[in-house]
Amino acid sequence: MQDKKRRAVSARAARAGVANELRIVGGEWRGRRVKLAAGAPIRPTPDRVRETLFNWLQPVIRGARCLDLFAGSGALGLEALSRGAREVVFVDRDARAIRQIAATLEALAAPSMPLHVSDALAFLRGAASPFDVVFLDPPFASGLLANASARLEDKGWLAAHALIYIESAHRDGPPVLPATWRLAKAKRAGEVGYYLVERRRRADEQAR
C-alpha cells in the first residue's frame, strides 16, 4: 500500500511538472537517482545541460577542487564528484537542501564533503581558499550573480586558471563578467542560458 501511495504521489508530481528526483548522468554514479529536498525552492540543472557542461569540463574535472555556491539540489557538485573531482564544497542557505545533499552523499557512500548552510555572499566574506572550478547557479532575478562573481574574483577564491560555470535567465543575455574573466562557451536550453567562463591571471598575480 505504501509503495502504491508513493507511486501515486510521484505521478501527480510529474503531471504537475514538479521534479522530486534527478539522475546523475555520468561517471562512477551514472544512472543513480538522487532525491530532492521536499519543500525547498530548487531548480535542478537539466540532464542534457549537465551532460554538455561536463563534456566541456572533461579535461579538467578529475582531481579538481570545486565550489557549488548556490547548491540547491547539489546536482552540479554531485556530478563533479561522480566524474572524479577531488573535493566539492556545497553552500546553500536552505538547511533542507544541505540535509538532503548530506543524505545523498551518505547513500552514495561518497567521502565526506564540506557542507555549509549559509547565504552565498556571507560565505564569500570568510577566509578564502582557491577553487579550480566554481558552479554559479543563483536564483534568477535575484541580483546575486554580479556580486558573487566580483567577490570570487576579488577575495582570492579562484585558482589562477579557474573555470566558472554560470546559469542565468536567457532573456537577461550573457552575464556581465569581471575584467579577468573570458566567456568561452555559451548555450541555451529553453529559457535558461548557460555559460563556461575562463579566468585569466591578473597582472599582480603574473608578477609573483
Go through the PLM ranges and name each one.
Residues 1-208:
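Class I S-adenosyl-L-methionine-dependent methyltransferase catalytic core
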